[in-house]
């Protein structure tokens, strides 16, 4: 039976562990890091065997506090507090249920309402950057650009600014059959508030959609919604289908794509780059750099990551189809791994970039399961900065497109999935550019 994690043990784990990712580039951390850090992660006390300052403070609270001690709540607060203290706003703790949901989502199996979000620092709220197809949120009328300002509705609502981003995010998550209630601000000046009560459900994520452009039958449009473990296969299906239909040019739409799993983006880029091309460079706090190049990748058949296998014969299989005949559509909500996708295709002169400057997130968060140490849950923290193959890093800056085109103002509040090809002026600009 798994144990609930003690606060002192979590504190030590947080001091030494390096973890796996969400909403950015994802890494699965296992034996390699354990070999690097050894068993010191799971030990308690200091090198002399005496209680640490953490142990002492926690035991004082447990012994003398007037209030009941909920260790799960304290774990969450401890990680958040440590993240705040070191300037890591992405640090977090997941209990067993939350970690199970997160793992399922990364494999394309979702329970919830079906939105992808980022933190909006300006308004201290949660910004919805995309609403997934066939999701409860889409059916309820939630729109990209909505700002979640309250969790709950009516008199029971709580301000996101007071809960904090991670705290509010957890209240949005939940399992099938439970109700998610929140209030959004939208419209001009965000003056309009809309309340939602949405039943959470199970749905399979559609990380890639595609179609032949209605305005040009020689152009295929592939929308990459996020990079999860389903994306490589769905991307190949999209490419093969469009090629079979006679398409000669391609638009890769990563507007509102928040990023995803590093293994996923590595596989997708491998289909369009040459073997030994640099995919990504990562640097830890010591400045140590790791360079990942295109090459065959083989996971164990039982590993969920086997969906991201790359056979040698599949490397560069679409390169000749897309080089000089494709464009990437971006906007301010194109983030993290989606920016890496954009920058790699730009650095190797595969695609033109059209749209607006991207979000600018070049940091890697890792999530480390505590099961190895006999505990439930997982912890997350920023472990590395990552850099594109050739260009300078874009963290905090974003990637400027080759052709800057703002989305028509009349479309700003329209669901991205409901904008037609004829209406989409950014898409039309990309089609005109690659068709010259």
Predicted features, each with a name:
Residues 147-183, 233-236, 263-264, 361-372:
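PDZ domains, with a preference for the canonical peptide-binding region formed by the helix
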Residues 51-105, 188-189:
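Interdomain regulatory linker/hinge segments that flank or connect interaction modules
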Residues 108-153:
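Glycine-rich active-site/cofactor-binding loop and its immediate structural neighborhood
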Residues 163-210, 382-383:
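PDZ-domain C-terminal substructure recognizer with occasional recognition of PDZ-binding tails
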Residues 137-164, 250-253, 353-354:
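Conserved PDZ fold ligand-binding element
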Residues 1-48, 54, 58, 75, ...:
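Gram-positive cell-envelope targeting signals
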Residues 101, 191-193, 204-208, 259-329, ...:
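Gly/Ser/Thr-rich loop/hinge elements
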Residues 88-127, 197:
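PDZ/PDZ-like peptide-tail recognition elements
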